[in-house]
Every structure is written in structure tokens, then in C-alpha cells.
Amino acid sequence: MPTFTEDECILIGCYLGETREETILNLEEMSEYISNEEADLDLLTSTAIYKLTQITDDDFYAMCDDFTP
């Protein structure tokens, strides 16, 4: 399973959906609005999306448990 950075976890938490697929779609939709001047955010988003595609749904739900208080 890939390791997520703190920044990736924050980004995923901001666009968290009910499922892994919904979260990926939320991030992809958000990335359409990133300007050329925000290359760091674009890279962070792309990396988070890629890593989300590399994990299982069970891993995703386990990771989401860390996001809830």
C-alpha cells in the first residue's frame, strides 16, 4: 500500500466522498479548476489520485477512520 504524505491526507480529507471512487472523482473535478500558477497543488492532487487508485476499498475505509474524530 502506498504511503500518503500529510499534505495528501489533508487534501483527501477536504474532498472525501462516501467511497474511494467518489473521492477520486471529487479530486478530479477540483483539479479542473487549478490554474497553471498552482503547479504544486496540481502535482499534489495528481499524486493523491494515483495513490488512491493503488489501494483497495478496505484500505481506503481504514484510512478514513483516521480522518474521523
Segments (PLM) and residue ranges:
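N-terminal acidic leader/helix
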Residues: 1-28
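Short acidic DE-rich linear segments
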Residues: 1-2, 62-69
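A generic structural signal for solvent-exposed, polar alpha-helical segments
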Residues: 10, 21, 39, 66-67
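Hydrophobic residues in alpha-helical segments
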Residues: 16, 31, 52-53
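Short secondary-structure subsegments characteristic of cysteine-rich extracellular domains
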Residues: 28-34
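Short, charge-rich amphipathic interface segments used for partner binding and complex assembly
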Residues: 35-65
